[in-house]
Amino acid sequence: MTRSQRLAPLVFLAAIVSLTAMTVRSTRAAAAERTTWDSVYTASQASRGETAYAKTCARCHGASLGGGDESPALTGGNFLGNWNGLPLSDLQKRIKTTMPSDTVGVYDIQLVTDVIAFMLRANGYPAGAAELPKEVEPLKEIIVKAGKPGSQ
């Protein structure tokens, strides 16, 4: 028996063990993923966001978040199609660095985060016991998911 013939079963076993370990890690990571369906904002935060939205965003995006001539809708299929699978930190950054279009960057980060909570409520995501954090790092861990879990 050649050396490669003797080592073949060990190489095969090592490959199986590696694949099993990677599968377990992937399964744990998927199970630990937080999404917008995990009640990531509070009702009072969404209410603050609604007030801020009415004062700062509605003139371009519409009172019902349906969009305007040059501003996209912030609810429904187009919005979810653009943001599905992305972290809320990306949405926060987009708003903070591009809105309002005539005076970019004037919105305080708490206001932006509260408006995101309002947008989540308007898109049918449930409220919870803890506020959506304004810090970027925790928002990187919350993924926008278009479809309600278990509805497929």
Give names to the regions the model predicted.
Residues 34-35, 70-79, 133-137:
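Short linear capping/connector segments at secondary-structure termini
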Residues 27-52:
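Electrostatic cytochrome c docking/interface patches
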Residues 10-21:
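Bacterial N-terminal signal peptides
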Residues 40-46, 65-100:
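Gly/Gly-Pro-rich "capping" loops immediately C-terminal to redox-active cysteine motifs
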Residues 34, 104-152:
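Flexible coil segments in periplasmic/lumen-exposed cytochrome c-class electron-transfer proteins
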Residues 63, 97-98, 121-125:
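Generic structural signal for alpha-helix termini and adjacent loop/cap motifs
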Residues 1-6:
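N-terminal secretory signal peptides that target proteins for export/translocation
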Residues 49, 53-64, 115, 119:
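The canonical Cys-X-X-Cys-His
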